[in-house]
């Protein structure tokens, strides 16, 4: 089964870094995406806020460059996480992160 998502946008929540009891580092943040997409011959506004989690040592170095306002492209897979309140939310598990040059 295919489960791939590529999403670009702006980090809109301060990254939260934790280390699991087994020693695996995790970085969590929220990515806000806004774009204009074409559907059925019409232009429509597309918008979402997607929670992102970066796990493992491989991508942790780049997460230290990520702050609120950073423009990035994230590639990975999606999965549901159950919150403490019992509600499920979709989360993007990042496997590759690229900083988007702001052109400044």
Curated annotation (Swiss-Prot):
The protein, known as: Replication restart protein PriB
SUPFAM superfamilies per the UniProt record, alphabetical: Nucleic acid-binding proteins
Complex and partners: Homodimer. Interacts with PriA and DnaT. Component of the replication restart primosome. Primosome assembly occurs via a 'hand-off' mechanism. PriA binds to replication forks, subsequently PriB then DnaT bind; DnaT then displaces ssDNA to generate the helicase loading substrate.
GO biological process: DNA replication, synthesis of primer
Entry annotated with the keyword Acetylation: no
Alphabetical UniProt keywords: DNA replication, DNA-binding, Primosome
Pfam families cross-referenced by the UniProt entry: SSB_1
Domain (SSB) ranges: 1-101
Keyword DNA-binding assigned: yes
Cysteines engaged in disulfide bonds, as pairs: none
NCBIfam families: PriB_gamma (TIGR04418)
Cellular component aspect of the GO annotation: primosome complex
Main function: Involved in the restart of stalled replication forks, which reloads the replicative helicase on sites other than the origin of replication; the PriA-PriB pathway is the major replication restart pathway. During primosome assembly it facilitates complex formation between PriA and DnaT on DNA; stabilizes PriA on DNA. Stimulates the DNA unwinding activity of PriA helicase.
């Amino acid at each position: 089964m295919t489960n791939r998502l590529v999403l670009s946008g702006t980090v809109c929540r301060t990254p939260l870094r934790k280390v699991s009891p087994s020693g695996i580092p995790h970085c969590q943040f929220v990515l806000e995406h806004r774009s204009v997409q074409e559907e059925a011959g019409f232009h429509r506004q597309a918008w979402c806020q997607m929670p992102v989690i970066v796990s493992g040592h491989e991508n942790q170095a780049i997460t230290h460059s990520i702050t609120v306002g950073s423009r990035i492209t994230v590639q990975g897979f999606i999965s549901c996480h159950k919150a403490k309140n019992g509600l499920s939310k979709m989360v993007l598990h990042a496997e590759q992160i690229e900083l988007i040059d702001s052109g400044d």
